[in-house]
Amino acid sequence: MRASIILALLLSLVSMAVASSPTRAEEPRNATLFKDPQCSCCEEYADYLRANGFDVKVVNTHDLATINEQHGVPADLQGCHVTMIDGYVVGGHIPLKVIKRLLSEKPAITGITLPGMPNGSPGMYGKKTEPFQIYEIGKGPKRIYATE
């Protein structure tokens, strides 16, 4: 009888431990962000990605134009940094909603880009004054991927 009570207590403790253990969270996505060492808004964008579940590695470079060129980002569509996520190029201060769409749809493009440094975009100061035009990067003519 005493052994059965001890066994019941042990089973209860094991059940409680299993029930209270946290479920495994989704693994963070890796992102590599290339930026100019002097750019603070790019650090803000890296923090934005981290706060939204990305594991971000920041690479400082004085030759961002070459990195953009190597990844197929046309000169007129370049943002102030380039991020690689799951094999896609993500140029500039693109909102998370658009990145999630890209990663879920997995289109046959090189990536997406938000040219320049628009006010009110993630990581940028100021108020959003107009919709963000986010372009596809790939072969062919310039095409809008999303408007935010």
Named regions from a protein language model:
Residues 1-2:
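N-terminal secretory signal peptides that target proteins for export/translocation
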Residues 6-17:
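Bacterial N-terminal signal peptides
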Residues 18-25:
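Sec/Tat signal peptide C-region and signal peptidase I cleavage site
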Residues 26-47, 51-52:
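Local sequence-structure signature of Cys/Sec-based thiol-disulfide redox active-site neighborhoods
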Residues 38, 62, 116-118:
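Short beta->alpha connector loops
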Residues 43-92:
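N-terminal, post-signal-peptide region of Sec/Tat-exported proteins
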Residues 70, 76-148:
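Thiol/selenol-based redox catalytic cores and closely related redox-interacting motifs
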